[in-house]
Amino acid sequence: MASRNIWCVRRNFLFDLRDWMLQYSAEVFLKSISFRPFSAECDSKDKESLEEEREDLLSNLVTMGVDIDMARRRQPGVFNKAVTNEQELKLFLLSKGASDKVIGSIISRYPRAITRTPESLSKRWDLWRKIMASDLEIVNILERSPESFFRSNNNLNLENNIKFLCSVGLTHKCLCRLLTNAPRTFSNSLNLNKQMVEFLQETGMSLGHNDPRDFVRKIISKNPSILIQSTKRVKTNIEFLQSTFNLNKRDLLLLICGPGARILDLSNDCTKKNYTNIRERLLSLGCSEEEVQRFVLSYLNMVFLSEKKFNDKIDCLIEEKISASQIIENPRILDSSINTLKTRIRELSHAGYDLSTSSIALLSWSQRRYEAKLKRLCG
């Protein structure tokens, strides 16, 4: 009897459980059906809202004078951001003295600027002002290189870089030059800047410099861009100078602390290619290996000239009956453009000045000095 009662209880429980499950499943099914249109409606509203925001963004940017096509090419992802701060950025830059035209140009070339918050911008600006003398100086840098300021919003990294560069003995004047000429230095990771400074210190010591910090200051002051290059590139260029000109440690040290510092950040391929062209061109004009090396060492800026520019200038001078030996003795004349060279050669010829037998140094003089000389020649 007890067994029968237990069986009845179990059967009733199972039937009740089945009824409850059927009822619950139906409710879930009906709820899922009833919620689907609502969910689709929400998605549609969100999409419409996002599209409206993007239309609003485009409208704002056009009003601000932004070149939309340029901005899309450079950083298209910015236009998909749900939140942007273009109006806040405009007000911030206006308060610092930037014109509407400059602001439009900045955003056109670096659209990501509109994703920075006012708080981050203000903090970063204050850090830059510790180096620069005025807001206008910073605005000028942003106009030339907006990426340098807006590329990173890691203000702690910027602050640490400033402290580190001060700690290695860079003067306020040197920091100002860095921020003006190579602002990306301050967006580098702190470790990257440390690696380059340590490399330069070790290089100075290996060449016999008794003050590694002073060596670093000299190199950076002469070539502010060096900190945004790789240690491999700088090392390869130093090795190139040493092997090409057969320099001992003392002479190499003097060279890279002086005029050689400027070419340390050049592309290694560019350095070798340009030097090879200079050498081959001058040898073809009858110059000796010694004359070629003396010519380049006396004015290392020659290495910056591309193959075409160098050859065109040499051809221009040779056509005007100026000898290779005269060019070797006056390398700075190659700083002048071809148009300047041709104009001055023509004017001097009309004034009765014989460049084939007289000094050609005046071809590289400043315009003011040259005009004074020409006036005297013309009587």
From Swiss-Prot:
Disruption phenotype annotation: Double knockout of Mterf1a and Mterf1b results in viable animals with no gross phenotype, and normal oxidative phosphorylation capacity. Steady-state mitochondrial DNA levels are normal. There are subtle effects on levels of mitochondrial transcripts: transcripts initiated at the light strand promoter and also downstream of the MTERF binding site are increased, levels of 7S RNA are reduced, while levels of other mitochondrial transcripts are normal.
Top-rank taxon: Eukaryota
| Subcellular localization(s) per the UniProt record | Mitochondrion
Which GO terms label this protein's molecular function in UniProt? double-stranded DNA binding
Expression across tissues: Predominantly expressed in heart and liver, with extremely low levels in other tissues. Expressed strongly in the heart and at lower levels in brain, liver and kidney.
Q: Which UniProt keywords apply?
A: DNA-binding, Mitochondrion, Phosphoprotein, Repeat, Transcription, Transcription regulation, Transcription termination, Transit peptide
- Post-translational modification (record): Phosphoprotein with mostly four phosphate groups. While the DNA-binding activity is unaffected by the phosphorylation state, only the phosphorylated form of the protein is active for termination activity. Functioning seems to be regulated by phosphorylation.
A Gene Ontology biological process in which this protein takes part is: regulation of DNA-templated transcription
Q: Which GO terms describe its cellular component?
A: mitochondrion
Q: Which InterPro entries match?
A: MTERF, MTERF_sf
**Family statement drawn from the similarity comment of this UniProt entry:** Belongs to the mTERF family.
Assembly, per entry:
Monomer.
**Function, in words:** Transcription termination factor. Binds to a 28 bp region within the tRNA(Leu(uur)) gene at a position immediately adjacent to and downstream of the 16S rRNA gene; this region comprises a tridecamer sequence critical for directing accurate termination. Binds DNA along the major grove and promotes DNA bending and partial unwinding. Promotes base flipping. Transcription termination activity appears to be polarized with highest specificity for transcripts initiated on the light strand.
**Entry protein name:** Transcription termination factor 1a, mitochondrial
Supply the source organism for this entry: Mus musculus
Gene name? Mterf1a
